[in-house]
Amino acid sequence: MSPILVRPVREQLEHDRVIRLLQAKFRRRFDVGINPGSEQNSAVASGGSTLYPDVVLLSQDRGRKEMAIIEVETVESVNGLEALAEWVPFGRLKSAFHLYVPAQMLDVARRMCTDSNIPVAEIHTYHWIGDEMRFLPAYKAPSDSRAPATRPAAAKPASPKPKPKAKPARKKPAAKPPKKTGRSPKRK
């Protein structure tokens, strides 16, 4: 449940509509679990507690591994209280945490993620063009951000390997002259 106790009705409808559009978008590649409004359909275990993100993407193979957690925010729900109450626990999970925010709130969301050290894998924006919702990727974390840093770098060998000799380039056949047509050349 969101720390915003009562979200305005119009924003709640927009929030739930974005969740359903994301479900349709990811339906072919993942098993999608959604939690619109106050519903608690798809849970994610985090230590001893259970979390209910807006969208849970599960792999379609036998293991049904969690691939990503998606949290959708509206203009009023992008705030510090929301970031600490929901984004921080989602960022601590093993699966990738994706954040969807309105286009005008992108800078605020990025600043909150950096200030609170929330490891978000991707931030996307959404906006309406006519009667169609557009989702645009705005930020993608470096690929090694979730990889453990305990691996030592591989030692370089003492002697460098000799490079193979480059083969000479093959000659291309000469270009054929253009065909003559019955037309006169174009004037410039």
Outline where the language-model segments fall:
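Active-site metal-binding core of divalent-cation-utilizing nuclease and nuclease-like domains
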Residues: 1-69, 76, 138
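Short secondary-structure transition/capping segments
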Residues: 12-13, 78-87, 117, 142-158
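Residue-level signal for functionally critical sites in structured catalytic/ligand-binding pockets
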Residues: 15, 33-35, 71-73, 86, ...
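A structural preference for short, hydrophobic beta-strand core positions in alpha/beta folds
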Residues: 32-34, 99, 125
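Polybasic, lysine-enriched low-complexity intrinsically disordered terminal tails
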Residues: 147-188
